[in-house]
């Protein structure tokens, strides 16, 4: 039986929902190891999201613009707190990252993009009607699972009692109130991030005026956030997609699966955590369905599982691999491309990593 990768959301969200320090900006890990020391911050013009970017914007202009990455979080969480080391490290390589959710998660009162109910709270409802809240401490939640919201993608969890691992097509486990807001895979938050970046680049009163490379934008995300990124497949403004610990699920006839064969003018990479990653089957099946001439890659770190290396120092190996992919596709960095090209791609030389490719030489 095919596994639903959202089984692992309970384990991931135990830490992913933890609040970031209550402040408008923060230096994470001394700004990262890249050439552009990064900062995590909020912008008054986009309070529903968190920005990760180089601290010194004076180094960027129309001749050296910042590519943009829009990011969706694991569990469709309204906070990037479970990924800050990773996002900060990638930003230090010279990228503007716009992540769904405010940095001050615990005190957030405003609804997130597309939200129709209360914001998720600690021990409260998971967003998107996917069931109850995840408890602190990593214990498996109980209680009533959520209902699939109207218009949710095929295969979205619905109903069912919690208290244990959810079934295929069953509800996310409970433990709190009903979740409100964005349905599973809803890319609205990513679209708002993208449109904000484009508008800021054109606004003469913005600190980002003329400094962003709006022709080179990536959509990326982990687990449920990876589904959000995949649902940007038909957005012509997106150049590449990073699907991390994620993949479409459903039947062979599902619209989501069919969309993979129709993808045009994009590249996509799946970054998985080995056979113990609950998204392993989903991601591999998606990769196999890629057809035509579009570049596609599947890389995996054996044994790391669904949680990845996001909160390891400087984001761990995931930041190295994702950063190289972004530098290749958004900056044209030939050295970075060697991580994925040639007879002996660099990813394959990294301990524990494997790589498969389509239309990449």
Question: What is the meaning of each model-derived region?
Answer:
Residues 118-128, 162-164, 169-214:
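Alpha/beta-hydrolase active-site loop
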Residues 239-312:
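The feature captures the conserved acid-bearing segment of alpha/beta-hydrolase catalytic domains
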Residues 148, 165-166, 172, 294, ...:
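Alpha/beta-hydrolase-fold serine-hydrolase catalytic core, especially in secreted/extracellular enzymes
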Residues 23-64:
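N-terminal cap/lid segment of alpha/beta-hydrolase-fold proteins
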Residues 192-262:
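Primarily recognizes the serine-hydrolase "nucleophile elbow" in alpha/beta-hydrolase
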Residues 81-109:
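Short amphipathic alpha-helix adjacent to the substrate-entry channel of hydrolases
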Residues 63-74:
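Short beta-strand element of the alpha/beta-hydrolase
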Residues 18-22:
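Sec/Tat signal peptide C-region and signal peptidase I cleavage site
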């Amino acid at each position: 039986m095919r596994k639903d990768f959202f089984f692992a959301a309970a384990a991931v969200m135990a830490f992913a929902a933890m609040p970031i320090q209550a402040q408008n900006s923060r230096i994470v890990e001394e700004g990262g190891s890249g050439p552009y020391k990064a900062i995590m911050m909020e912008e008054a013009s986009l309070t529903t999201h968190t920005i990760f970017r180089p601290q010194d914007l004076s180094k960027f202009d129309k001749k050296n613009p910042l590519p943009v990455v829009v990011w969706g979080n694991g569990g469709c969480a309204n906070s990037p707190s479970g990924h800050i080391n990773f996002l900060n490290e990638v930003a230090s390589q010279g990228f503007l990252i716009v992540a769904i959710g405010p940095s001050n998660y615990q005190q957030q009162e405003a609804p997130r993009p597309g939200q129709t109910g209360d914001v998720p709270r600690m021990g409260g409802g998971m967003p998107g009607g996917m069931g109850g809240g995840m408890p602190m401490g990593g214990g498996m939640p109980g209680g009533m699972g959520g209902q699939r919201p109207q218009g949710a993608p095929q295969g979205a969890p619905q109903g069912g009692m919690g208290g244990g691992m959810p079934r295929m097509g069953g509800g996310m486990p409970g433990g709190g109130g009903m979740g409100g807001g964005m349905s599973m895979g809803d890319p609205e938050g990513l679209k708002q991030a993208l449109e904000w970046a484009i508008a800021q680049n054109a606004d003469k009163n913005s600190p980002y005026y003329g400094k962003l490379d709006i022709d080179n934008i990536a959509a990326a995300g982990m687990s449920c956030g990876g589904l959000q990124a995949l649902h940007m497949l038909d957005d012509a403004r997106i150049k590449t997609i990073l699907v991390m610990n994620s993949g479409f699920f459903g039947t062979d006839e599902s619209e989501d699966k069919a969309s993979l064969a129709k993808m045009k003018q994009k590249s996509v990479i799946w970054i998985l955590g080995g056979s113990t990653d609950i998204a392993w089957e989903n991601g591999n099946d998606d990769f196999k369905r890629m057809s035509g001439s579009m570049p596609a890659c599947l890389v995996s770190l054996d044994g790391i599982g669904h949680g990845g290396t996001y909160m390891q120092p400087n984001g761990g190996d995931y930041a190295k691999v994702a950063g190289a992919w972004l530098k290749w596709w958004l900056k044209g960095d030939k050295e970075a491309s060697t991580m994925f090209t040639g007879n002996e791609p660099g990813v394959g030389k990294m301990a524990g990593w494997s790589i498969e490719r389509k239309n990449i030489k």
